[in-house]
Amino acid sequence: MSRRIAFLGCLFLLGLTAWAQMRNLEGKVTDESRQALAGVMVRVYAGNRLLGFTTSGRNGQYRLRFASAGQDTLTVAFSKLNYEAFRRRLSPADRRLDATLRRGERRLREVVVKAPPVRTQGDTVLYQLKSFLQSGDHTLEDGLKRIPGIQVDESGKVSYMGRDISQFYIEGMNLLGGRYSLATKNIPSDKVTGVEVLRHHQANKVDRRDLTDNVALNIRLSPKAKLKPFGTYEARLGHRSDGVLYGAGGTGMLFRKDFQMLATLKLSNDGRMGRNELNVHFKGADWSSEAERALPLLAGSQPSMSETRYQTSRNEMASLNALRKLKNGNEWRLNVNYSHRRSGHDYAVLTKYPDTQGQDITVSEQADFRQMEHLADLDLKFRSDRDTRLIENSLTAHGRFAEANAAVLNADVAHQERQQMDAFGLRNALSMVYRRERWKLNFGSTVQYVGMPDNALDFLQDSVGASRQRAYGHHFYTEETFYTGYQLLPALTLALPVKLMAKANRLQTRWQGDTLAVNALQGWDGTLSASPQLEYQTAGRRFRATLAVPLTLIAQHYRNTARDLAVQAQKFCADWWLEMIYVPSGQVEWRATSRQQHGFGDIADLLTAPIQTDYRTISVRSGVLGQYRIMSADLSYSWQEPLSFWHFTAQAGYNRRFSSVVRGQQVSSDDVALLEVARPHTADAVTAEASLSKYILSLKTRLSMDGAYGWQQNRSWSQDRFVTTYGSHYTVGGRFSTNPIEPLQAEWRLAYQQNRLRGNGTDSRFGSWSQQWRVAYTLWSAWRMEVSGEWQRNSLPGGGDSQSFSFLDAALEYKFRKPKLRLRLELNNLLNVRSYRYTVYSQLNTYVYRYGLNGREFLLTVTL
């Protein structure tokens, strides 16, 4: 442990060393008439190496911070369109350099202006999307994947330099909120001119002076896309071993200066059309309830591969989104979303549970899972954003109706499980912020209700002996916040945030036919916290530090009338939180956080009667309100050179958790009991990761490398004894994509992961190789041929047989010029791989899975 702490300390000291080598330069740029020049590019070079850059503001002033060794010979270059370039050598003592630019004397009869691929203005980096697109990039999401520093994961979530974006704008307007995949997957790439990366972004004008580490994206559309409505429409037809595949859908869009609208309707059974488009990528309302957490919907286990490989699914989705911009910073937004999904998959699993006698308890199962879900949301939002005040209110309605079925064969005994779950909710969130001279006031109020009138799980064994487990209840929640801050000095603010939270719950669980297996919970809890804090920020928004001391008072009053159990408690705790953000230049950013946080159990701890969560698993709580304390520290560093397309990020963190309750399991050949035991214990975790990428514009080539390390120590309860386990892993990988000549395109990803698990009488090491590749070639600007593959190999501990699988896909595409039509024939899983086997090692148990996969499929898509 001391070595890991020393490692973090060294990383921190390296950061301090880097800060000590920074140098400042400022000045003013004017023309020959002594008028200020804005938009002049100022660059500092050490030889041919670029150290830093910036642009002059409206008043001609510029300020630049860069890293330099004392022996460097430095040159400052000033450049602006229609002006002669100006260069000057910088001496070690220079801290200010003014420049006068002369207009260019040469006049060209005919000038062709080509926009640069990337431009910077302060904290904003603007990428010209066309410069990075490759053949076959049809949607905005395809284009975002090409931009240096931007990543898009399997779910559609967008991040920049490893940090998830906090806002997504289209022409400066937030139409979709967290469901921005509706835009990235449906806006054609040829309708987009630029992508703006807004670093240190503040969504509210009233807070624009505060430095943050948030990142946002703003999509710039072409002039034609803003003149009239446009859309994309597609239909598909295909075949797979389980039947005919189909899909049809369309998306219409309108983006005006004061009004935006996006509407989509799609239905399919191929598992791809509309997939992940309604995912919410920002943190929002939590619609789960205690009844759902006590009896979650049957889902089964899922492998570490794309769900299109192993799931059969049928999807219908509809979405209507509109935003009306009014005068004085006011706007109304309406988002209505509905989805219906049916999915299924099957697998066989061999589970090994450790026993105290040194013998494993082994259970073999064959499972077939099916799910159906209706999900609907309506959100009406008003926002008034001005320089000195913000008013925002959001009213949301939510409904979810789901069913799940599982057929499990265990020791030649057939088990049927059928579950039905209905839930609905209503939420209103109000926020008001005022800033006047040195004062800042913030008031927020959130009220939410979630009801689950029905959550029933039925069990049948060999089609007889039906029994039922139910869990239903109601949940009410309110949170009131008040923040007041006063600016003591230009750089120092004293603030006092106050928060009042209250929850009221009613929860019942009942095992049909057993009057002893009943829980009848009701109660409430309240939290009052005040967090005196100091906020320090330099005038140039280069450094910001916040130190807070949360003081919290908690009152809890719970009863389980069916178990004659009641708990009343009042607790007080004091914590601390420290955050620092340092931006020495436009290329470098440091962020450090450290905190201590207390937490306490809730009403669910009184679920002392067993709850049957599947045919062989029961869950029992201790009846004791648990307590925990978390101490954590994180340090992150990011560096970028947007003009030369270099990006680097690194992060390290440590987490320690003290808890009064240990969770674990008690296993027999027939049942698995998930339980809690009151006993103090400590868990530790260390993480570190880094990533480096480079984009070569002339070759349209992107290279990246990344690595990660993790270590953890945990305690759990198993078979009437405490077990301590230690786990560690590291991952290294690389990515390569290139479009060196217009017709040829290639991509390749390679990753290796090594895991080690010690404890509970075992010491296992196992690794995994994976790679993905794709090659495409375009002929005569109309035909496009594509071949792609996926391969994974898992090595087992003890020299056991390795487990591997391979997929091969192909596609042929033809693009018409008039009408603007595209035909695409896909041939997926050409090798007709029908099963996938892999092994998972958890903290206590071992699982050996064999999943059934979708067979070879053919799919023809027409896109307009």
Where are the regions a protein language model picked out?
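A short, solvent-exposed loop/turn motif at the edges and junctions
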Residues: 46-49, 73-89
